[in-house]
């Protein structure tokens, strides 16, 4: 019976507004279905996630949702879950492991997100732009693939160059700190055309750093980021951000459906894609009102 399902969910942490939305959405979907969801917050540490997955295996759960903090180092614990015949669904990120070790991945195509951000920026600047980049957590599939996608587009434009790139760890505080160092290193905004941030929270931190340095976001430096959290829509409505690409946080439904399908012996695709659109300031106020 579906109502009797017990699912373990190992979440990375709560480093961003988007991550919190994802957690709340998955918890709400489990409650709606009457599932028993065992939740573990890893606080950004892979060792905590591995412990959590082993605990879920020991408890004999029916399925495991894993949002992997980094791409590598999962083979052993995934093999343990497979031996226990517990399906593992990767949530919003991927792993560098044999795909037979997990049931499916429910996630956006991060490369597409990076490419979409770069395409928008190329059109906005006529292919001429010095870019500073705030990368996500080092080693995460989101950071690796968003950068790869972005770079794949700007490589076609000789006058689009990333002049500074550093991780802000997907946090607002990290984004602010790194943007402060970028502005200091470049002597302000005069040599910077745009900021590409791997998530909105880092962009929001960077916007604060710009304002404190007397730099006008969107006027002196264009701002494009990914996630579509409520606060970035407020920033766009206030004229402080230019574009965001939505990362869909509502991944619980397709993840739970995949586990149910596997229990029935049905074939499950190895990647269930959940990509969202690019939003601009013209709809920002209405989107903020809907999402806040």
Predicted feature descriptions by range:
Residues 72-112, 123, 130, 136, ...:
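Flexible loop/hinge segments that line or gate small-molecule binding clefts
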Residues 7, 49, 105-131, 144-145, ...:
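Hydrophobic alpha-helical segments within soluble ligand-binding/sensing domains
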Residues 5, 134, 138-142, 153-154, ...:
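Hinge/cleft segment of the Venus flytrap/periplasmic-binding protein
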Residues 66-82, 150, 164, 168-234:
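Hydrophobic alpha-helical
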Residues 18-35, 113-117, 141-160, 174-179, ...:
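Short, solvent-exposed amphipathic alpha-helices that sit
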Residues 6-33, 37-51, 55, 59-61, ...:
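Extracytoplasmic "Venus flytrap"
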Residues 1-6, 31-32, 36, 76-86, ...:
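Short, low-complexity disordered leader/linker segments with a strong preference
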């Amino acid at each position: 019976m579906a109502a009797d399902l017990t699912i373990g969910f190992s979440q990375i942490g709560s480093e961003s507004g988007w991550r919190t939305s994802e957690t709340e959405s998955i918890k709400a979907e489990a409650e709606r279905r009457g599932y028993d969801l065992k939740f573990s917050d890893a606080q950004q540490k892979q060792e905590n996630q591995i412990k959590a997955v082993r605990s879920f295996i020991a408890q004999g759960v029916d399925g495991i949702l894993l949002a992997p903090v980094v791409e590598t180092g999962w083979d052993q614990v995934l093999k343990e879950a497979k031996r226990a015949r517990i399906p593992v669904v990767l949530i919003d990120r991927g792993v560098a492991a044999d795909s037979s070790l997990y049931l499916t991945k429910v996630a956006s195509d991060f490369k597409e997100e990076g490419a979409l951000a770069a395409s928008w920026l190329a059109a906005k600047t006529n292919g001429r732009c010095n870019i500073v980049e705030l990368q996500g957590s080092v080693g995460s599939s989101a950071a690796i693939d968003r950068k790869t996608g972005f770079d794949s587009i700007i490589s076609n434009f000789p006058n689009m160059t990333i002049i500074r790139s550093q991780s802000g760890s997907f946090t607002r505080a990290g984004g602010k700190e790194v943007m402060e160092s970028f502005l200091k290193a470049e002597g302000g905004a005069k040599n910077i055309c745009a900021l590409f941030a791997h998530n909105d929270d880092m962009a929001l931190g960077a916007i604060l750093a710009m304002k404190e340095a007397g730099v006008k976001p969107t006027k002196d430096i264009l701002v494009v980021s990914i996630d579509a959290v409520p606060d970035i829509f407020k920033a766009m409505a206030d004229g402080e951000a230019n574009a965001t690409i939505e990362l869909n946080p509502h991944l619980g439904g397709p993840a739970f459906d995949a586990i149910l399908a596997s229990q029935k012996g049905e074939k499950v695709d190895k990647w269930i894609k959940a990509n969202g659109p690019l939003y601009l300031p013209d709809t920002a106020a209405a989107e903020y009102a809907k999402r806040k």
